[in-house]
Amino acid sequence: MKRTIKVFVGDEARLVGTLHYDGVGTRERSAFAYDETWLGAADRFALEPGLPLVAGPQYHRKVPNGSAFHGAFADTEPDGWAKKVILRDHAKRRQEARRAGNEPKSVQLQTIDFLLAVDDASRVGALRFQDEDGVFCRSTEAGRRTAPPLIELGHLLTATRAVETETETAADLAYLRGRGTSLGGMRPKCTVVDDDGRLAIGKFPSVNDERAVTKGEVLAMQLASASGLQVAEARLVDSDGLPVALIRRFDRTANGGRIPYESAATLLGANPAGSQEHFYTEIVDALRVNGTTPQSDIEELWRRMAFSVLITNVDDHLHNHGFLHVNRGQWRLAPAFDINPFPERIRELKTWISPETGPDATIDALLSVASYFRIWLSRAKAIIGEVERSVAGWRDQGHAVGMTEAELEPFATAFEHREREIARRV
């Protein structure tokens, strides 16, 4: 399969370049070339450090566990839950075609199919893809909202539960098409329109949950805000008696405009097929090169590390850190998101603090890199103290969120542990 896709940026649809895809079975590759008008624009910027502003094609080959595209494009691909919905929808359509006596054309979906299955209106960041017919991929169909209002949460929840339990109908999948396929992550979720008309992410409880996960995430996000972190706005809403975490999208302006976004994995050029570990100190280095306000973002990153250590937020991989474009290739740290307490997990960070500390989620590891972050030791200790005092109120904050003692208790070991005691003595 060969495809040629035009790449645009923003609501004004400015042409950035052309993406060429060539795939046969598991052998997939792509090439991106900036358009000469973009290269000549006064406000041009590289979509990522791995795609410098040069003329001509820049190639990328798919690697195991990776994408066929450069990181800037791969960051907008569906994975986890969204990929599952797309695969189930594809299988259901093939079944229906056979029942109608038609042999389906497509047997296996390729990376390009997933990239273009994301709805244009709710795709993460500001990149937009236009097919060979000049149509923006997965644009809103006439008379159909791809990002539904909150009033439809019940319908969304019913459809996602059907997919989870493998009892979905063609109607369930048709409803989720474009609605439940624009976001990454493993848990069931969907883009929705909040009461004020802005985009948000609705995160649903899973049928496999053994604790109140959605409530726990909102608790963590609100604790993070109380600890001085810049975080995505989060609250709980009720849908037919079930708690849905509603997270405000930060890649949109107040009036709905798109903001370019990239993950820390893309900023660092991380190879998903490699066994190499990555470190917060690498993010510090990247901010010093590419950041618009590097030192304030570096201190913010330090505060986030302290918070993660104190609440056992150990799913802090590079795709759970992001950046928003400001101007001419300068980026700022995006608000914190996907923060969760994990009481059942070993206290080891996915992103190591530094090569020397390893995965240890400890106060000692934090303090050992204070000078690398250019934070005075006294200031580093003060930040740890501020965060610890906020985390100490986790039960009260949980009650404010609406959690019962029975719902809070399974989270206790994520908040009450030796590092909290050490933080109090710092």
Sequence positions of predicted segments:
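Phosphate/dinucleotide-binding and metal-coordinating scaffold of catalytic cores
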Residues: 1-318, 322-426
